[in-house]
Amino acid sequence: MGRGRSSSSSSIESSCKSNPFGVSSSNTRNLSTDLRLGLSFGSSSGQYYNGGDNHEYDGVGAAEEMMIMEEEEQNECNSVGSFYVKVNMEGVPIGRKIDLLSLNGYHDLITTLDYMFNASILWAEEEDMCSEKSHVLTYADKEGDWMMVGDVPWEMFLSSVRRLKISRAYHY
C-alpha cells in the first residue's frame, strides 16, 4: 500500500529533483525558518518563509510581540476603569476582591462589604455605633500603614489604598 502522490507540486520539489530532501542550497534558509514556525530572528534579507507566502519582517521578534500585546491588553484593562483590591475578613479563610472604581463612595463600599461578608461593618463615620457583633474596616496604604476607612476623602483613599481588612471590633 503506497501513498498516492498529490497532483500539485511545490516550487521546492520541482526545482530540486537532484537533492534527496528536495531542498536546494538557495532555499535552505527559507526551509529552516519554516521549521521554526515562520519566525525569523535577525535575518539579513528581512523576510521569512510562512507557508509559501513571503512577508516582510519588521524587526520585532516573538518575545517583543508578546510584550507589546500584553502592554496593550493591560492598557485596555486599565482604560475600562477598574481598580480591584483584596478584602480579608478576620476569621474567614478566603479573601475576596472588590472593584473600588465601580463604587460611588464610602457608603457604597460599606453596603457592598456588608452584603458580601454578611456582617455589620463600621467605619470612621459610624465609629461610636459599636456593638458586640460589629466589625471595623481598615485599609493598608502605600507605605503599609493600617488606617481607618473614612478618615480621608474618597479620592485620596482611592489613590492610597492597597488592601482592605475587616477586623472584629473589640470593646475595652
Swiss-Prot record:
Comp. bias (Low complexity): 1-18
Induction or repression: By auxin.
Subcellular location: Nucleus
Organism for this UniProt entry: Arabidopsis thaliana
UniProt family annotation: Belongs to the Aux/IAA family.
Domain notes: The N-terminal half of the protein contains two conserved domains I and II. Domain I includes a slightly degenerated ERF-associated amphiphilic repression (EAR) motif which seems to be involved in the activity of transcriptional repression. Domain II is required for the correct degradation of the protein through the SCF-mediated ubiquitin-proteasome pathway. Interactions between Aux/IAA proteins and auxin response factors (ARFs) occur through their C-terminal dimerization domains III and IV.
Motif EAR-like (transcriptional repression) per UniProt: ranges: 35-39
GO molecular function: DNA-binding transcription factor activity; transcription cis-regulatory region binding
Biological role: Aux/IAA proteins are short-lived transcriptional factors that function as repressors of early auxin response genes at low auxin concentrations. Repression is thought to result from the interaction with auxin response factors (ARFs), proteins that bind to the auxin-responsive promoter element (AuxRE). Formation of heterodimers with ARF proteins may alter their ability to modulate early auxin response genes expression.
Biological process according to GO: auxin-activated signaling pathway; gravitropism; response to auxin; root development; somatic embryogenesis
Annotated segments matching region Disordered: 1-28
InterPro entries: AUX/IAA_dom (IPR033389), AUX_IAA (IPR003311), PB1-like (IPR053793)
Name of the protein in question: Auxin-responsive protein IAA30
Domain PB1: 82-171
Record's keyword terms, sorted: Auxin signaling pathway, Nucleus, Repressor, Transcription, Transcription regulation
Main location: nucleus
GO cellular component: nucleus
Subunit structure, interactors included: Homodimers and heterodimers.
